[in-house]
């Protein structure tokens, strides 16, 4: 039955024009799934990673930093749709400040680094079929961003969702697009090789790549980290932040007892009865930002040596074929995480960076924060925090979770929260202009739906 499932999946991918390299990788993971791989990493098989370099202690000369940055390319993951916020396109296209989107601010950051260091610093997006057109349209408004004849993007691969009952490719006539999914952001390495972009970058003299999620405005180009990475001689290094009690979800690095390799463990790879170890900020003191640095030359050599398969751990993701309909057919998506490649490279390391390099926007709570006066956006597209610490935002998900609902309830902009420790909104409230929140601000559900008047203090 499952042999038929694999063959059917391979035919479906070939008919859709998926790269042969991507089909080979999919086959590897399909066979792992068949063999019963769960991707789980029990606590007893690892040692916590507690000692890593800190950017605060790094000493790199201006010239070393500039030289390393001149050989660096920036790759931003831009293939996911902001479905959790009700979006049907890339989150990076949401406006942040003065009509500028995440993508516009990213371009500002890249152009500022080019001016400061006199380097070419290409910016390349990893898009999906569903994010490509809109994103390239935004970049078309910045013709100066393209350099060295390199493309502005490359496409991540796609693979069939598998029926959970028999592992055959799912069929969904209501929307055949929903029969497909991306193979997780671990696909970046396969897609770089299969697209020819990896060879093109090496041919033009680029040696290092820095990657991050396109919604993380904190992950600006850093000549200092580039200089550290080049000097370290390591093939691969993620940026890590020190955990706080709020950081219970982010993946962490650990040392595998069997071979001493550094590995990444995410929540989906942790046995349920061991989640208390995973969330212990003292046992596993750093979390993974998904800002990564890797050596393009070593990546190519490793991929060629392994027949294009890095062998990242499988993430078995159980979903429904229509993510918006929990009663639709159960499916399994075969995924890998970009950060899991840390275990594929001997000599991989990591670096602790300040919290300012991790500003992801996963929810409308995060979006309110980056749009608020907690941050100022400078001419270089960098977000600078105004108060000593960020305000904690909690908006009632019944009324603010989806972007359309969120925008409708802040027609005159978000409130001032720079003098607030927290902002909690219960119920359905529409905010007027110039609302100011201070201290531990709270709006109760009683009296809603309603409007909070212009100039109110809460």
Describe the residue ranges of each PLM region:
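Left-handed beta-helix
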Residues: 1-73, 227-458
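N-terminal glycine-rich phosphate-binding loop and ensuing alpha1 helix
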Residues: 2-152, 161, 172-182, 186-189, ...
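Hydrophobic/aromatic beta-strand patches that form the interior of the parallel beta-sheet core
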Residues: 75, 94, 124, 153-155, ...
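Conserved short loop/turn motifs at secondary-structure junctions
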Residues: 122-131, 214-216, 355-359, 363
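Extended, hydrophobic alpha-helical segments in both membrane/secreted and soluble proteins
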Residues: 102-106, 213, 236-238, 457-458
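Conserved core of the sugar-phosphate nucleotidyltransferase
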Residues: 120, 137-209, 213-296, 300-304
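Surface-exposed, flexible loop/turn segments at secondary-structure boundaries
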Residues: 82, 131, 160, 217, ...
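Residues immediately flanking
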Residues: 78-79, 214, 296, 364
């Amino acid at each position: 039955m499952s042999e038929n499932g694999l063959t059917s999946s391979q035919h479906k991918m070939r008919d859709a024009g998926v790269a042969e390299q991507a089909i080979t990788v999919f086959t590897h993971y399909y066979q792992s799934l068949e063999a019963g791989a769960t991707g789980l990493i029990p606590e007893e098989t690892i040692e916590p990673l507690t000692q890593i370099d800190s950017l605060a202690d790094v000493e790199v000369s201006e010239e070393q930093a500039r030289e390393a940055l001149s050989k660096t390319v920036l790759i931003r993951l831009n293939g996911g749709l902001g479905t959790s916020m009700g979006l049907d396109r890339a989150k990076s296209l949401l406006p942040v400040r003065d009509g500028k989107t995440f993508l516009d601010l990213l371009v500002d950051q890249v152009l500022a680094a080019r001016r400061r260091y006199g380097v070419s610093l290409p910016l390349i997006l990893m898009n999906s079929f569903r994010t490509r057109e809109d994103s390239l349209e935004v970049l078309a408004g910045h013709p100066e961003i393209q350099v060295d004849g390199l493309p502005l993007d490359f496409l991540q691969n796609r693979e069939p969702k598998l029926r959970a009952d028999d592992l055959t490719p799912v069929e969904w006539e209501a929307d055949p697009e929903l029969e497909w999914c991306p193979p997780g952001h671990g696909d970046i390495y396969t897609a770089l090789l299969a697209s020819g972009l990896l060879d093109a970058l090496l041919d033009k003299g680029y040696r290092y790549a820095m990657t991050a999620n396109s919604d993380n405005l904190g992950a600006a180009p850093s000549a200092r980290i580039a200089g550290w990475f080049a000097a370290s001689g390591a093939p691969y290094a993620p940026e890590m932040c020190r955990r706080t009690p709020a950081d219970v979800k982010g993946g962490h690095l650990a040392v595998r007892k069997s071979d001493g390799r550094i590995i990444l463990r995410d929540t989906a790879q942790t046995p349920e009865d061991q989640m208390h170890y995973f969330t212990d900020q003292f046992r596993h003191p750093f979390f993974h930002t998904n800002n990564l640095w890797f050596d393009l030359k070593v990546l190519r050599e490793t991929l060629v040596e392994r027949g294009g398969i890095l062998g990242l751990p499988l993430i078995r993701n159980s979903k429904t074929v229509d993510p918006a309909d929990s009663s639709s057919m159960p499916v399994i998506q075969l995924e890998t995480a970009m950060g899991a490649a840390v275990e594929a490279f001997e000599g991989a390391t990591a670096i602790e960076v300040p919290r300012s390099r991790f500003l992801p926007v996963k929810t409308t709570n995060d979006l309110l924060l980056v749009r608020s006066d907690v941050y100022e956006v400078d001419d270089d597209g960098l977000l600078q925090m105004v108060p000593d610490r960020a305000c904690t935002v909690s908006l009632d998900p019944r009324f603010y979770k989806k972007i359309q609902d969120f925008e409708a309830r802040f027609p005159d902009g978000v409130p001032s929260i720079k003098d607030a420790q927290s902002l909690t909104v219960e119920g359905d409230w529409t905010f007027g202009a110039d609302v100011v929140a201070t201290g531990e601000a709270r709006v109760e559900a009683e009296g809603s739906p309603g409007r909070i008047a212009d100039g109110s203090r809460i």
